Amino acid sequence: MKFTTYTTFPEQTSNESLWILVDSEQLQSNLNTYQINNLESILTATQFKANFNETLPLFGQLSTQPHSQLLGLGKAAELQAAKLAKLAQTIIKSAQNKFKHIAIDIAALPVEYHYLFALSLTQAAYGYDEFKSTKNEFVLQQVDLISSQTSLDENQLALVHAVQSGQSYARDLGNRPGNICFPEYLAEQALALAAEFPDLLKVTVLNEQQMADLGMYAFLAVSKGSERPGRIVTLEYQAQLEQAPVVLVGKGVTFDTGGISLKPGLGMDEMKFDMCGAASVLGTIRALCEARLPIHVVGAIAAAENMPSGKATRPGDIVTTMSGQTVEILNTDAEGRLVLCDTLTYIKRFNPAVVIDIATLTGACVVALGKVLSGLFSPDDTLAAELQQAGEQSFDRVWRMPVIDDYQELLDSPFADIANIGGPHGGAITAACFLERFTRDYRWAHLDVAGTAWLSGSAKGATGRPVPLLMQFLANRVSTNG
């Protein structure tokens, strides 16, 4: 979906439908620029008050655009960012199967929300029908945004288009089933991205023999139970090689049965989403390539499948990580931290400026924060603040959680340097504390997206989060560093 901005309604246009956002406090003044026939009688007859998400079709009363509607904002001055998605869904649901080209007058919308509203439109327009015999009839391609004043300059529009591309790509990857999207498939996707952007991307793929040569036995303890071999994939975005890179590390467990510590059968199908951290890294790299931001970034994907078999790791097994630390694996369903710890050690070779790992790591984080906020863990106050700011700007929000030494003793093992679980309490925190032991040589943050990477129920599917957050974070660094 492509966006164009205008200061007034264009006289020469191919748009087929017009939506006018209206403030309940300034209903008449919002409509002064349009010659709407019988406006007073229409408002009186319908009792339209421009309450939030209230719609009023004009049924040909606007001569310049016969297919036009009003959409209420309520009191625009009190509008919250959380409501933008609902407005976007109302417009997209009405338009996307009918019109190729629509216009939306956003003059009544607070200027600071213009970027988020455009982004919300792209998110609402996403549909996944790859394996459906009958495809979705989505025809909407072009949206004109009209406002005499807007924050959507050329750079902001480019960022919207890039995030749309990357987030949709991440959602597609997340929605694909485990029999299609397995570790080698993720590696193939990375190589395909490099072929699409050969001037920007360098991709390296490690196989299991190479991992063994590097001593990555925590990672291999997860992948050994599956017939699908694991892969570690790095994608280097080479726009500014003289900079120390931002490294993004994604958990890519393409299907998680729990291994020998088998998960319950109910809802296990959703464990195809356990690679959404990796999907978000691939999506962010795609968005970077689309936006061509001048920044050095490395994406790393820890791709494995966690399956039970005669070769699978047993509870109580002890392995040596690439860092040299030993781990007692008390629960094979705490596998994400095992593939991540070796990957977090491996990426030290890039001499990173900062490292952010993204993982659907713990159910405990879902219990703590639900499906609204991602968990943010970092011992670095400055880095944490930058991520929180980017989350607010992109409305891909996070909540900072503790990662402090007080919790480390919960990971003590009588037989190894560390256990891979820390008992029944504070599970999201002890998981982050486990990872922290492998990240002490660089600035690091951990995003637990177990609650935000996908939705269940009628809206079931991958969300593509936190691609908007990560892209905003990177764009902010470009702006700050020039």
Curated annotation (Swiss-Prot):
SUPFAM superfamilies: Macro domain-like, Zn-dependent exopeptidases
InterPro entries given in the database record: Leucine_aapep/pepB, Macro_dom-like, Peptidase_M17_C, Peptidase_M17_leu_NH2_pept, Peptidase_M17_N
Annotated cofactor note: Binds 2 manganese ions per subunit.
EC number, as in UniProt: 3.4.11.1, 3.4.11.10
Gene3D superfamilies: Leucine Aminopeptidase, subunit E, domain 1, Zn peptidases
NCBIfam families for this protein: PRK00913.1-4
Family: Belongs to the peptidase M17 family.
Name of the protein this chain belongs to: Probable cytosol aminopeptidase
Annotated gene: pepA
